[in-house]
Design a protein with these regions (language model features):
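Ligand-binding cleft/hinge of the Venus flytrap
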Residues: 24-30, 119-126, 131-174
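Early extracytoplasmic/lumenal segment of secretory-pathway proteins
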Residues: 1-74
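Short, hydrophobic alpha-helical packing/hinge segments within bilobed ligand-binding/sensory domains
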Residues: 48-52, 179-183, 234
Length: 304
């Protein structure tokens, strides 16, 4: 029996279904001689994956599926993993296009999906056709997950540190994106940046979905595998996770953008433009510099 330890920190609003899928996968793989063990992180669990992996005594997994992007973006964490990673991005055919181009990160990280964030508003004049850097009083959420952090990083990357500071100073920031959605629904904020799954609740008469001028902000997730597990077993698990059943489920139930070519489903937010931090931004702004600003403006942020 080949043991395989998978760390999972993925789509929290669909987690019950994810867990059911993985329990079934674990049973199927056992029949093939692979003993898959899944450890979950994120909402509903004691800590996020990046918080655990940042600890000096953290046990490294064989496999990772994560939308907690600090695992890959904080060099202090990723350096623990990167030298042992297989070129998993070459293992499965992917759907080519501007969304994939926006989230590629070399050969070691296999893009799985992206959560598109868009405007939800009751006042289209406040946000229609406007850049994220232009909005004052924007509601957004995810202080300790990638939704909030990626927004700040993307604005900093394109418009500068001052724009990121202004966003944090004027924004109405909630613990989670659903909190930002509720602020607009209750009339406490004019516009929120939320996962499109929430914004699709807009009725088109009193509430509306609009896209930022930059395009939807993408929160991607990745699969990666360390050479602590035989490559054949890692490839088998990758193919079983990034499969039509789970990919189609994510599209149909989450309006998510999927990258494996095994699915024919499409998010309603797919288009020609997307907003992500520029790759070179990570080379010029350290994790320490980012968190110095982020933590100073958001006292409840967990600073590694």
């Amino acid at each position: 029996m080949t043991p395989a330890l998978l760390y999972w920190n993925h789509v929290c609003i669909l987690h019950n279904q994810e867990k059911n899928f993985l329990e079934g996968l674990t049973a199927r793989l056992r029949e093939e001689g692979i003993a898959l063990e899944v450890r979950y992180f994120g909402l509903g669990y004691p800590e996020h994956m990046s918080e655990y992996l940042a600890r000096p005594d953290a046990v490294l997994p064989d496999l990772i599926v994560s939308a907690d992007l600090e695992v890959f973006e904080d060099s202090r964490i990723f350096k623990k993993l990167e030298r042992d990673l297989y070129p998993a991005a070459t293992w499965l055919p992917l759907r080519q296009g501007p969304a994939l181009d926006s989230v590629r990160r070399g050969t070691r990280l296999l893009p799985f999906l992206s959560i598109p964030l868009v405007y939800y508003t009751k006042d289209t004049s406040h946000c229609a056709g406007k850049r994220l850097s232009e909005l004052k009083g924007l509601a957004f959420g995810g202080i300790n997950n990638s939704a909030g952090k990626t927004l700040v990083k993307a604005v900093w990357s394109r418009y500068g540190r001052g724009a990121a500071l202004s966003l944090l100073e004027s924004g109405a920031v909630s613990d989670m994106p659903i909190g930002a959605f509720q602020q607009v629904r209750l009339g406490q904020s004019p516009t929120a940046l939320v996962p499109s799954l929430y914004a699709l609740r807009a009725d088109g008469e009193r509430s509306f979905l609009r896209r930022p001028a930059e395009g939807p902000l993408l929160i991607p997730s990745y699969f990666c595998a360390r050479n602590s597990i035989p490559e054949g077993a890692a490839r088998r698990i990758a193919a079983e996770i990034l499969c039509p059943e789970l990919c189609d489920f994510y599209v149909e139930n989450g309006d998510l953008i999927l990258y494996p070519s095994c699915t024919t489903g499409h998010s309603r937010q797919e288009g020609a433009r997307y907003f992500t931090p520029a790759p070179e931004w990570y080379e010029t702004v350290s994790a320490e510099e980012f968190y110095a600003l982020y933590g100073a403006m958001l006292p409840t942020a967990h600073i590694p």
